[in-house]
Structures are given as C-alpha cells and as structure tokens.
C-alpha cells in the first residue's frame, strides 16, 4: 500500500478549508496551519490589532447564492447578504461537516517555507514558542492578502490621526470627528459608510471613478441577475451595465 502524499495548507479561512476538503477527497494526507483559534480567517471578528478581521458591522458584499460552496449551501434562513457572524458560523459548519478539524493545527505560525533539493517542502512552524520543522510533498498557500497593511506615502505633514483600515475594528473611534477615507475598494467604502453614522463629517477620496453598484435590482441580489451580461462583448457589457447603474443610482456627485 502506497503512503499518501503529504500536503501542507497554510490558512484555515474560506480558501484553506475548501482546499483541505478537496485534497482529502483525493486521499492525500493534509495538515492545515492557522495562527488563529478557529476556522474562518478574517471572517472571525477580533479586536486584536494583529488579526486582520472584518469590521464589527461587516456583511458580505456578494450574495449568498454566489458565495456559498457548491457542495455545502448556506442555510436557507440566511439573508441574501449574511453578516460576518453568520459567515464565520457557516465556515465552521463546513469544517465540521467534512471533518476537517482533526487536520487543522490552530495557533500555529508558519515561519518559513523552503523547497529542498529533493523537491520536498520544508515547513518551519512556531507554536507556543516551540519551533517545528515538517516536510511535505506539496504546499497550498491560502493565507489571503489582508494580513499585512500597505501604507501610501504622501508629501507634507498631517497633524491628525492616520489609520489603515486594517486597524479599524469598531467605528465609535470616529465619533464627532471629521474623517477622510482614501480609496474606493471594499474596505474604504465600508469605513466611509459606517464612520459617517457617528462622525461630524466623512469624505471619501478616489483617484479615479468607480461605479457604486446597488445590492438589489428588481428586488434580487444584483450579482444574481447581472451574470448573463458577462456573455456580451465587453464594449456592450460596459455600456449596458453603466446605463443600469445610472438608472438606479444616478450620479455619484448626487450623494
């Protein structure tokens, strides 16, 4: 009987657990390392600055229809755009359903990954101050891209408080303050929307134009009815999508 190949998966978030499940389906020996205490990655809310978690009010921006696993649908009672608590519970249910927990080593940091002369991955990990080295036949990196904040450089001096969205957990810190949000990505828009509820004023700065897409069109999640447009030629798709957004949202300047 052949010994199954060993695969290391870094991260027990949505991608990591999906990778682990499918690798186990192929009868491979899988070990998942995650520095957190629970399945879910950044969907597990935490006030700890070192953990790049969602905000306290975060809901997913894609519908549950297009965000769920094909082999494990989200609960029928979930809303179209579930909260971070519901998402974390869903990922943990997925891990329990497919018996992934025995393969996950929590509170473990991957220190180094090296490919040796025998094409084996030498994985160095740290847990509770103990350094361990383990060899694997393959490596799947599923740690995401939100864990390390990147700061832009601006000339001059700013006398106020400068923060990265990575450091924002709760929005009471913006109470009665004037806030400038730089960027038009998901995190920037979330910070702008949530901070304006408590701030004296919130402005958002974009270096280029963005379409702000409504979550619902005709009472349906937008991403579930717009998919057919993707089959159109790009020029027609852009014009059609732009016309739809202008019809339902108007101009950004109106807001």
Predicted segments, located by residue:
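A short alpha-helix-loop-beta-strand transition element characteristic
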Residues: 45, 56-59, 103, 201-204
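Feature captures the FAD/FMN-dependent oxidoreductase FAD-binding
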Residues: 79-147
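Rossmann-like dinucleotide-binding core of oxidoreductases
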Residues: 3-4, 8-39, 44, 92, ...
């Amino acid at each position: 009987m052949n010994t199954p190949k060993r695969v290391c998966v870094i991260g027990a978030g949505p991608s990591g657990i999906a990778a682990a499940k499918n690798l186990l389906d192929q009868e491979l020996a899988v070990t998942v390392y995650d520095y957190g205490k629970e399945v879910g990655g950044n969907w597990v809310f935490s006030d700890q600055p070192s953990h790049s978690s969602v905000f306290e009010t975060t809901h997913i921006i894609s519908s549950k229809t297009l965000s769920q696993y094909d082999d494990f649908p989200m609960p029928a009672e979930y809303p179209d755009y579930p909260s971070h608590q519901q998402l974390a519970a869903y990922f943990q249910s997925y891990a329990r359903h497919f018996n992934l927990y025995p393969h996950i080593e929590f509170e473990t940091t991957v220190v180094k990954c090296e490919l040796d002369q025998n094409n084996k991955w030498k994985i160095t990990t740290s847990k509770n101050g103990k350094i361990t080295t383990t060899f694997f036949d393959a490596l799947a990196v599923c740690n995401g891209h939100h864990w390390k904040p990147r700061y832009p450089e601006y000339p001059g001096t700013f006398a106020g408080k400068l923060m990265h969205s990575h450091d924002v957990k709760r929005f009471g810190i913006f109470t009665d303050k004037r806030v400038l949000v730089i960027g038009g990505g998901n995190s920037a828009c979330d910070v702008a929307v949530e901070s304006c509820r408590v701030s004296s004023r919130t402005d958002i700065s974009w270096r280029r134009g963005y379409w702000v897409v409504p979550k619902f069109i005709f009472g349906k999640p937008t991403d579930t009815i717009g998919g057919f447009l993707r089959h159109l030629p790009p020029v027609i798709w852009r014009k059609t999508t732009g016309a739809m957004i202008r019809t339902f949202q108007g101009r950004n300047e109106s807001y």
